[in-house]
Amino acid sequence: MPIRQLRPYFLCACLLLTACNPLINFFAFHPDASYIQPSEALPPGTEEIFFEAEDGVRIQALHLHNPSSDIITIFFHGNAGNIYRRLNDYRRLRRLGTGVFAVSYRGYAKSQGSPSEAGIYRDGKAAFDHVTKVMGYPAPRIFIFGRSIGSTVATDLAQDKDIAGLILVSPLSSARDQASVMGLGFAAPLTGNAFENAKKIKRLKAPLVVIHGTRDRIIPIGMGRNVFDAATSQKYFHEIEGAGHNDLSNRFAAEYWTVISDFLKQSAKNR
């Protein structure tokens, strides 16, 4: 194979060498700061909020109010696009009986800075602090929702917290496992402790639901099972037959949203 054809594989290998390497940030995050919806285009009852992470970076969030509910869901999206491209998901989630606090990672949409693993964990902590300390929600009335790379923020944040529940959609288990999936097993030992979902989930106290498509080629369902198997709290695993990585909430909407609705109702009732 010509050297130029091998270049992407070398770049991916470099990405996986260490969580501190800028290359991992380059390949792991694909922020979009250009697609911004005007306020009048947002769902009714949506408030734009800004708060600061502990390192001073200004972070944006959208709060979809739900006056008929005393619970709220902090939502962490995937690695591409931004919060404005997921408005339909937020609307659907609110219709299930929860307020929604959708967080824009640093470097995405109107948030300042550049994304990194450590940085998005700071953003998650700051979001939780804002929801509890400024908005006044007690932890037992808060759900945390993470999809794809957002599962890493959600899991990191949920550790040891007395929250209502954790929802993980298509979660990765670790950078090490992702390296193997990409055919870069030789680099797996060098990934350190990057994105260690399966390790961190052991410190989860709250109920957990993991949702994964059986035909996910980006983060295979085996990773979701690894995360699920490592959890020791009350837990549920739901596989959606035939679903891939990016079509769960639309093509398989009926099944997907029913699972989430049932989990919200059951977990909130028990708190």
Functional labels for PLM-detected ranges:
Residues 215-219, 246-247:
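Acidic catalytic loop of the alpha/beta-hydrolase fold
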Residues 151-206, 254:
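Hydrolase active-site cap/lid region
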Residues 137-148:
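Alpha/beta-hydrolase fold nucleophile elbow
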Residues 225-229, 233-271:
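C-terminal catalytic histidine-bearing segment of alpha/beta-hydrolase fold enzymes
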Residues 89, 197, 206, 220-229:
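Short alpha-helix in the alpha/beta-hydrolase fold that links the catalytic acid
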Residues 54-130:
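Membrane-embedded segments
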